[in-house]
Amino acid sequence: AGIFLAGYMDRIGLVPLIGLQLVMLATSGWLLRNSLGYLPESSMGRRGSTWVDMMSGLKLVWHHRRLFQLMMVVAATGFLGFGLYLVAMPLLTREVYQQGASFFASIQFTFMLGMIIANVIIIRLVGRFRQPGRVLLTSLLIRGLFLIIMALHPPVWLLFLLVLLWGGASGVAMMLGRSLTHEESPQKYRARVVSVYQLSLFGAATVGAWLSGHAIASVGVLTAIGTLGATIAQ
């Protein structure tokens, strides 16, 4: 609903939409605060250093071969996939297809729809994968191929189909990445390892978005998408 509402930015205006979002966020925070119970300070116990907890999770991943390799794949997913998506899709909408906010909102919705469909399917099939790591790598390859086709400036209907499939492949990667992270991490350190997973995915996405912006500024949107797609496929 939020994506569709943002699609009306050209008609409503940016300031009213941001104001509405602030009201909704404040309302959600107030409702969440009222729905949570209160714990006495004495029952919370003594908490250790957050920095020490973070470093212990990083050290565990560093010395665990399978977890380290998994985090490298997750980081590649964020760096080459989501980073490019964050920067390239708005520019592709405006500069290549000469469209506005409603078109971009439709792309966002299509991508998220692909992720939701993939998650529903993976929930049913995740226990049947004998080699989930190979499926994870295959999803990375498939996304690279989708980007290469997208760089050829396809018609609008094919673009949306590619975005849907791209979102589906991204959903597969995220779902399997989380599942493998939970399976491989020791019970005692699971929360810390999951935090490393989040850091690998979204931290690498931030760097990937920055580099994607420089690549697009240097060679153009379509060329940058094709180049990064070929890099992912390799």
Q: Language model features by range: what are they?
A:
Residues A1, V73, V196-S200:
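Hydrophobic alpha-helical segments of secondary membrane carriers
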Residues I3, T77-L86, S170, A205:
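Conserved extracellular-gate-facing transmembrane-helix segments in secondary transporters
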Residues A6, V15-M24, M55, W62, ...:
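C-terminal transmembrane bundle of multi-pass solute transporters/carriers
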Residues V23-E41:
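C-terminal membrane-cytosol helix-exit motif in multi-pass small-molecule transporters
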Residues N34-S35, S42-M44, Q69-M71, A88, ...:
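Short, hydrophobic secondary-structure boundary micro-motifs
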Residues Y38-M72:
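Juxtamembrane intracellular "pre-TM" segments in multi-pass secondary transporters
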Residues W62-G83, L164:
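Pair of pore-lining "gating" transmembrane helices in MFS-fold secondary transporters
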